[in-house]
């Protein structure tokens, strides 16, 4: 399925010295976002920093949202994950895309100019109408069982 998403380049280096975000393969779900920083930066252990991507998007469809997700290699190998765990970009947001990076490791990490720091996935969104009830219609096997209710493994 092809869809159009409006974007603005906020950093003039994007598409020139810094590669434009793109899908790595035909089957990639996530578009890699790059660090549009002036100079390489160190993220100290336990530190969280906001990193600009050099662009803004406007989805312009309440049936869509963008999710910013960590890159698996950065998280697994270096402990670099998103400070907010998942970034949610609403369809009516038009501001700069920023990535909150958190170094959860015990080693400092050097972010280089133009480095792939997160990935963006466009997802469908439903906005259901909620109906207040006194009791739910059909009881389920799980019922009100919450955290850990279905077993330990």
UniProtKB/Swiss-Prot annotation:
Keywords: Hydrolase, Magnesium, Metal-binding, Nucleotide metabolism
GO terms (BP aspect): dUMP biosynthetic process; dUTP catabolic process
Biological pathway: Pyrimidine metabolism; dUMP biosynthesis; dUMP from dCTP (dUTP route): step 2/2
Cross-referenced InterPro entries: dUTPase, dUTPase-like, dUTPase-like_sf, dUTPase_trimeric
Highest rank taxon of the organism: Bacteria
Annotated SUPFAM superfamilies: dUTPase-like
An annotated Gene Ontology molecular function: magnesium ion binding
Catalysed reaction equations from the record: dUTP + H2O = dUMP + diphosphate + H(+)
EC number: 3.6.1.23
Cofactor: Mg(2+)
Task of the protein: This enzyme is involved in nucleotide metabolism: it produces dUMP, the immediate precursor of thymidine nucleotides and it decreases the intracellular concentration of dUTP so that uracil cannot be incorporated into DNA.
Family assignment from sequence similarity: Belongs to the dUTPase family.
HAMAP family per record: dUTPase_bact
Protein name per UniProt: Deoxyuridine 5'-triphosphate nucleotidohydrolase
């Amino acid at each position: 399925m092809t869809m159009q998403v409006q974007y603005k380049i906020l950093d003039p280096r994007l598409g020139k010295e810094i590669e434009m975000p793109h899908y790595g393969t035909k089957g990639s779900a996530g578009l890699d976002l790059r660090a549009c920083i002036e100079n390489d930066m160190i993220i100290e252990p336990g530190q969280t920093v906001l990193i600009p991507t050099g662009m803004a998007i406007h989805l312009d469809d309440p049936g869509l949202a963008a999710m910013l997700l960590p890159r698996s290699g950065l998280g697994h190998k270096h402990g670099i994950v998103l400070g907010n765990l998942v970034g949610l970009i609403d369809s009516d947001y038009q501001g700069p895309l920023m990535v909150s990076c958190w170094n959860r490791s015990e080693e400092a990490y050097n972010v280089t100019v133009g480095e792939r720091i997160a990935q963006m996935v466009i997802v469908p969104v439903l906005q259901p109408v909620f109906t207040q009830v006194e009791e739910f219609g059909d009881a389920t096997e799980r019922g009100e069982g919450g955290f850990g209710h279905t077993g330990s493994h």
